[in-house]
Amino acid sequence: MDIKEKIEELRAELHRHNYNYYVLNAPEISDKEFDDKMRELQDLELAHPEYKDENSPTMRVGSDINKNFTQVAHKYPMLSLANTYSEGEVTDFYERVRKALNEDFEICCEMKYDGTSISLTYEDGKLVRAVTRGDGEKGDDVTDNVKTIRSIPLVLHGDNYPSSFEIRGEILMPWEVFEELNREKEAREEPLFANPRNAASGTLKLQNSSIVASRKLDAYLYYLLGDNLPCDGHYENLQEAAKWGFKISDLTRKCQTLEEVFEFINYWDVERKNLPVATDGIVLKVNSLRQQKNLGFTAKSPRWAIAYKFQAERALTRLNMVTYQVGRTGAVTPVANLDAVQLSGTVVKRASLHNADIIEGLDLHIGDMVYVEKGGEIIPKITGVDKDARSFMLGEKVRFITNCPECGSKLIRYEGEAAHYCPNETACPPQIKGKIEHFISRKAMNIDGLGPETVDMFYRLGLIHNTADLYELKADDIKGLDRMGEKSAENIITGIEQSKTVPFERVIFALGIRFVGETVAKKIAKSFGDIDELRQADLEKLISIDEIGEKIARSILLYFSNESNRELVGRLKEAGLQLYRTEEDMSGYTDKLAGQSIVISGVFTHHSRDEYKDLIEKNGGKNVGSISAKTSFILAGDNMGPAKLEKAKKLGVTILSEDEFLKLIS
């Protein structure tokens, strides 16, 4: 596998994990594994700037936006924090701050509570809006649900607060409430929540506020924004906020030295296990707001803060058996079934084994005592075997299966890949259902009223066997089914009918062609007039398209070489989907930026970064991630990074403001 293919593979993998984490609330890997993959991708992109892509996961924050809520723009971008698991990197952060400020400073150390982020807006002492983090620039308005959380004041105490301000924090589900909720779900034979974070996030997105109220969510607030804040100190502002009625952690501490910072980290690395809520690290912030402003931001995170993540906990337990799960792409994942063991405050009974190489490397046998970790405190995995605990009665060696556990097809393994795949795309149940779930998702066909449970029911009843079958459903076919009244049935049919107006690029993405994500789908839609042109394209034509390499091109060719796929696309075409480029799709396209490479940097007022990327592409320009002598100009918002500014000046690259850019393309 060459470097470009490795970068593309990591991007595709991280995009998938972002979606699972932020949209589905169903993470497949731990925080640490995600961070490690992200860091690997960042290192590769840094070493190979020729493959930089503004749509790379390294350039985004992630999203938890839900189409069932109104989306609201954040007045101040809600950025994520840079993460580290290393004390050495904490020292590096401290030294960077010291050198940049060249004056005395304090570090505010706070518990990193493991819940779901929220932004609360107060006007004249009353709560007027509660918005999730979303993609950092806009989030879901969940005000009604947040008003059910008793630790969040609806009306403030006193009268010395600003007339309008924003306060941010974390919505949490205490361990005790989480465990009781899972006991209730288990009794009803419903899927359990993986952890309190998922439970809090899922609860906040419920449509029924009375159920939200019953879940007993809690909240800690940790940052004030706005004009006329009472103090320059972040810590001091939090103490004032506590007087107004906000729940502020009393564990927060101001540190004068790096030694004090490490004392705080080391103490809570042990004592956090005794807290009533989940934590996964310590947040370090420069205390002075003036100094924070001077340090500024990168595109993704503030330079004045960092999150130190605690190392994973480990426990020893017995391996009872290994089962296998099949995903949408046919990837087969081995799962270890274990004796129940307490780990990071939850009971662990299953752990991921990832792939055949991991199983072979561990030399696993049934009955082995194995070490289980929860990297980043979420997904358990087996990291080792206590071979000294083996008796002379060694259990059966675990060998990766050769046939699909769902349909019996012989598994295959693509060159250069660790996973095994079931090739039976059109008749393997988990693949069929997974493809339909991808097809109906928000970023694809966005079909209202349909979700995984409904898809599963329709499939079990034989109503659908592929995505094209959706367009043959009638309201009479589905009304009267379990929890499916006449109104619900009509809403689903209406949603399916409305999806016929979804533009060509999203239909291409919805097809689920391997390695064809949103960005590649856009490139394809711009390069081909309709699906027939794409189907007839050869390798040479495909790889001539910007950002489509041989790996993606061969995947497209493989997809259309399958007769079942060609038949499916034909049926979708007959159903009336937009498998062609319309004049509306191409409206707004110009060549005003043709041949120009443009870097976006900073925080913007008029449009989001993604909207500016679209404007650049629609006007014939190319988004690039790093500044070089070939850069045509930089579109700069507020808080442009000083390193980029210095490099631009050194290379003589033009810097345009938002207004100048909009005038240029008008």
UniProtKB/Swiss-Prot annotation:
GO cellular component: cytosol
UniProt cofactor(s): Mg(2+); Mn(2+)
Catalytic reaction equation(s): NAD(+) + (deoxyribonucleotide)n-3'-hydroxyl + 5'-phospho-(deoxyribonucleotide)m = (deoxyribonucleotide)n+m + AMP + beta-nicotinamide D-nucleotide
Catalytic residues of the enzyme: K112 (n6-amp-lysine intermediate)
Residues the entry annotates as binding NAD(+): D31, K32, E33, F34, D35, S80, L81, E110, R133, E170, K285, K309
A Gene Ontology BP annotation from the UniProt entry: DNA repair
Keywords: DNA damage, DNA repair, DNA replication, Ligase, Magnesium, Manganese, Metal-binding, NAD, Zinc
Residues the entry annotates as binding Zn(2+): C404, C407, C422, C428
GO-annotated molecular function: DNA binding; DNA ligase (NAD+) activity; metal ion binding
CDD domains according to UniProt: LIGANc
Pfam families: BRCT, DNA_ligase_aden, DNA_ligase_OB, DNA_ligase_ZBD, HHH_2, HHH_5, Nlig-Ia
Record-annotated BRCT domain positions: 588-666
Enzyme Commission code(s) on record: 6.5.1.2
Segments passing through the bilayer: none
Functional summary from the UniProt entry: DNA ligase that catalyzes the formation of phosphodiester linkages between 5'-phosphoryl and 3'-hydroxyl groups in double-stranded DNA using NAD as a coenzyme and as the energy source for the reaction. It is essential for DNA replication and repair of damaged DNA.
Family: Belongs to the NAD-dependent DNA ligase family. LigA subfamily.
Name of the protein this chain belongs to: DNA ligase
Source species: Bacteroides thetaiotaomicron (strain ATCC 29148 / DSM 2079 / JCM 5827 / CCUG 10774 / NCTC 10582 / VPI-5482 / E50)
